[in-house]
């Protein structure tokens, strides 16, 4: 008897979104301007949004991207777009006071709505849908925490509720969870098309975008301006905005000591039949679970299962993480057994010690960083707001009021301590998985 074919037998080791992106303009070998009002370092979502807004304000803007537009996390994510942070509204108000805490949360809501409006305004074909999402409880105790989260969201007017396991059948084709938090203000998009659309919008507004140009160092001049030294020569700028997130290197040493690059991996299957896709996700929701080593998944616009997670805190190959994710996907959705995995890839997520995004000024530059796994809405919005702040004289975002903590360990950009942290999280997830269901 022949063995079943390996689902990973012919996987492409690149992001699905990049593979499906139409050809883009060649932005390499363009001459750099000598002097600008705003130099943006990083050509992802935050950088392109800042460049667009700066140019709209009439500034001379140059964007410097070491690889290609959207090459990093901006085109490697699951494409899930939603308000909120690790901490809900009630926790934010407890930590930062009622006024600031609520303002911070509402910025995340504004970011989601700004995303939808920008896509509409610029005519970006990013397959944006308002689908809502489910956070699935791996244990009964987690469902209790999710009920608290639903109550917290209700205090700021968000439509959220919890459902128990029997009700899950109307939302998802799995019996692996104890229940879920359902949040309606949420959605999905194609992140590669979104960042490409923001880049095109920035160019239409007058920004100059350059690929294959690595920023090496930023130094201050006596006249208050900065010199950005690059692999293609220097640029003098009145303001510098750094938007490198999980790919931050020596160009911004102060940020590098505050942002930890953590790997996240994704697989995507061949397109599913309409019947199988509907059985798995009848309402087209975005999904993620309540573990520390969480899984997140969704159906893509062409009905592929996209399944991701932090498969390991140890250095791992794409093939190894793809195998781990395949096993996880089949535990959640055994009906996908035998479906071929077509794409597998990894990327770096920028995490901060307080698990919050940050925007502000540090070491002579302005920055927006720390997506913490939920950056599609908030980071480009912060890029937009940062340009308004430093060029247009608008108030700083509420998030700029937060102290940006250093990583409390000897750390210069290589998170050597993550494997030990990961094992602690894995043990907590194992214990949660052993809880008995409640009657």
Regions found by a protein language model. Name each.
Residues 1-38:
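Extreme N-terminal leader/targeting segments of oxidoreductases
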Residues 56-76:
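Glycine-rich FAD pyrophosphate-binding loop
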Residues 27-28, 125-135, 167-201, 205, ...:
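Helix-loop-beta segment of a Rossmann-like dinucleotide-binding subdomain
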Residues 113, 121-129, 215, 223-225, ...:
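Active-site substrate-recognition segment that forms the wall
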Residues 313-317, 322-435:
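C-terminal catalytic lobe of FAD-dependent flavoproteins
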Residues 84-166:
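Dinucleotide-binding Rossmann-like beta1-alpha1 core, especially the glycine-rich loop
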Residues 38-63:
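N-terminal Rossmann-like FAD-binding beta1-loop-alpha1 element of flavoenzymes
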Residues 144, 151-152, 178-238:
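Helical element adjacent to the flavin cofactor pocket in flavoenzyme catalytic cores
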């Amino acid at each position: 008897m022949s063995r079943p074919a390996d689902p990973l037998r012919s996987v492409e080791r690149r992001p699905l979104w990049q593979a499906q992106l139409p050809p883009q303009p060649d932005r390499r070998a363009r001459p750099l301007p000598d002097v600008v009002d705003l130099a943006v370092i990083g050509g992802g979502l935050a950088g392109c949004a800042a460049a667009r807004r700066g140019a709209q304000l009439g500034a001379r803007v140059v964007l410097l991207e070491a690889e290609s537009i959207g090459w990093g996390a901006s085109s490697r994510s699951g494409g899930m777009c939603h308000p909120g942070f690790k901490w809900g509204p009630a926790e934010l108000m407890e930590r930062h006071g009622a006024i600031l805490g609520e303002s911070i949360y509402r910025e995340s809501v504004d970011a989601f709505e700004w995303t939808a409006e920008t896509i509409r305004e610029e005519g970006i074909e990013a397959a944006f849908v308002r689908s809502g999402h489910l956070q699935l409880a791996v244990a009964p105790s987690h469902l209790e925490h999710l009920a608290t989260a639903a109550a917290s969201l209700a205090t700021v007017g968000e439509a959220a509720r919890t459902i128990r396991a029997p009700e899950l059948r109307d939302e998802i084709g799995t019996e692996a969870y104890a229940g879920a938090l359902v949040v309606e203000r949420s959605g999905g998009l194609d992140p590669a098309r979104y960042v490409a659309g923001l880049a095109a919008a920035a160019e239409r507004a007058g920004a100059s975008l350059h690929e294959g140009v690595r920023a090496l160092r930023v130094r201050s001049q006596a006249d208050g301006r900065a010199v950005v030294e690059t692999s293609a020569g220097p640029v003098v700028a009145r303001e510098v905005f750094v938007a490198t997130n999980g790919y931050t290197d020596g160009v911004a040493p102060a940020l590098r000591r505050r942002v930890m690059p953590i790997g996240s991996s994704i697989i995507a299957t061949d397109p599913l039949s309409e019947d199988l896709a509907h059985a798995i996700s009848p309402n087209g929701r975005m999904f993620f679970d309540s573990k520390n080593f969480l899984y997140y998944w969704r159906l893509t616009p062409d009905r592929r299962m996209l399944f991701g997670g932090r498969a390991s805190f140890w250095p791992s190959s794409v093939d190894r993480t793809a195998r781990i994710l395949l096993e996880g996907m089949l535990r959640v959705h055994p009906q996908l057994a035998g479906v071929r995995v077509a794409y597998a890839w990894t990327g770096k997520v920028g995490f901060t010690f307080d698990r919050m995004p940050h925007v502000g000024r540090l070491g002579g530059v302005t920055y927006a960083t720390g997506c913490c796994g939920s950056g599609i809405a908030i980071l480009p919005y912060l890029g937009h707001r940062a340009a308004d702040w430093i060029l247009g004289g608008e108030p700083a975002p509420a998030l700029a009021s937060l102290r940006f903590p250093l990583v409390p360990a000897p750390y210069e950009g290589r998170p050597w301590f993550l494997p030990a942290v990961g094992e602690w999280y894995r043990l907590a997830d194992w214990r949660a998985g052993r809880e008995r269901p409640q009657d």
